[in-house]
């Protein structure tokens, strides 16, 4: 049963260390190691700002973990109504060239699990923007609905063209 795989101890230790971040440097991701090692070598200790940032990262990690558990549990006892609370744990995949407008920052996030859109490879052109990702998601959804042998053309998240041929040969 899946419930046996829910971690209690590790998450509790992470939360306790994050709560005590004024006195504890908590690393929850190997990607954090180089910056902390550099700071320790340079200053002999981590700064309060670093510890606070790492604590925020830790609480984001535990919230994402809890959101995944909540999502799983909801599938085990579906209800007809909409939930009062719906936690969504998102994991950053990449920064995008810009947000919805060129003066805005943006990033692509995914939920826990696989998504074909996040594993795609850009074959040609610039780094994608937020709007480019919306176009890709719109095209993917339309082609998925039309089925094999279909194509979609999307501009600013609006379908400009779509075609389907049952036999592509």
PLM feature segments, named:
Residues 31-169:
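Active-site loops and adjacent core secondary-structure elements that bind or stabilize anionic groups
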Residues 1-28:
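Active-site cavity-forming subdomains of large catalytic enzyme subunits
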């Amino acid at each position: 049963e899946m419930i046996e795989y829910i971690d209690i101890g590790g998450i509790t230790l992470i939360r306790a260390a994050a709560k005590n971040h004024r006195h504890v440097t908590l690393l929850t991701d190997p990607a954090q190691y180089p910056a902390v090692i550099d700071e320790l070598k340079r200053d002999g200790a981590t700064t309060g700002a670093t510890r606070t940032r790492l604590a925020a990262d830790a609480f984001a990690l535990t919230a994402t973990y809890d959101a995944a558990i909540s999502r799983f549990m909801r599938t085990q006892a579906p209800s007809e109504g909409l939930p009062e609370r719906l936690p969504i744990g998102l994991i950053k995949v990449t920064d995008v060239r810009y947000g919805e407008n060129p003066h805005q920052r943006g990033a692509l996030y995914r939920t826990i699990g696989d998504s074909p859109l996040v594993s795609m490879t850009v074959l040609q052109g610039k780094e994608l923007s937020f709007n480019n990702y919306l176009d890709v998601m719109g095209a993917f959804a339309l082609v998925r609905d039309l089925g094999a042998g279909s194509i979609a053309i999307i501009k600013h998240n609006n379908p400009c063209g779509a075609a389907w041929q049952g036999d592509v040969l």
